[in-house]
Amino acid sequence: REIMAAPSKGCEENIVEFKILDLVNNVQSFGFLLGYQKKVYKEQDPANIKAAESMGKLHDRLKEIGYDGHPLEVYLVRLLFCLFAEDTTIFNKQQFQDYIEFRTNEDGSDLAPKLQELFQVLDTQREKRFKNLDEQLAEFPYVNGKLFQEILPMASFDTKMRQTLLDCCYIDWSKISPAIFGSMFQSVMNPKERRNLGAHYTSETNILKLIKPLFLDELWAEFENIKNNKNKLPEFHKKISLLKFLDPACGCGNFLVITYRELRLLEIAVLRALNKSGQGFLDVSEIIWLDVDMMGGIEYEEFPARIAEVAMWLIDHQMNMLISNEFGQYFARLPLKKSAKIVH
């Protein structure tokens, strides 16, 4: 006997057929019943399948040469942060790409020590850096956040691996959605590992279906009732800034990321209501009260836990850029001082 699984009628290309005996190997095909969405990366998405494949190639090659386990996981998360950073004003535009292109050999022989040096610089305050530091390195900001703190074993690169990393740099990461960040990044792992880890991607639509009636709709309704009351607006602002959220099985942080983003959008609406005169604020940093440490999660595996933590920094930065555009002041939280509390 055979079973057919199809997410919706009229979608013949999505139909999966298999024998009942093979059900255990195809149970993921029924993920749509629980709101899980198949990992599909559209070509128009900046973080598209090309990015996932490039990171996957780098992951596979590093693993082949023996760079594996915890060091590899941390290494990849760091690289992806750098790729995101140079396209979103955390770094200067193409700063990471230029460093690789102009400060490392084409054969990749010195890429590993050069990256090691960069990671150390990103974890060192400017005033504590060596006075004779390479000028291109010296321009990188102090990131902190413990992301670059751990000293990892030295990796090893060749010509193809260096080019693969550069191919990742050539992709535009500026529009990356941290909501699919974890799903995309875990796609560098092989399918068998993904199935064992239960690395599902819950669609943004389904996450919103859950959190809106749970608390978001109520908060927006409360805001609508007091948005013209200058006395109650600060009280409401304080209320949402004191909220705490926990996802006890957070995976790569999809729920946490989208929840935080929606709360930051609500905060922007509050600030907009407080600034009806259009005069702006003297210091935007003083009136941004929501931060990533209001979000917490529990995850058994270290890799998705680290991804979730970084994804929270990324969505926070995106929302800070939105604030910057809204009120005409550049606002970025660097060095990183707070983080989502992800326990693994």
Regions found by a protein language model. Give the residues of each.
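Nucleic-acid nuclease catalytic cores
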Residues: 1-9, 76
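Short, conserved active-site loop motifs that form the nucleotide-linked donor/cofactor pocket
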Residues: 340
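Flexible phosphate/Mg2+-sensing switch loops adjacent to catalytic phosphate-binding sites
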Residues: 92-99, 222-241, 263-293, 316-337
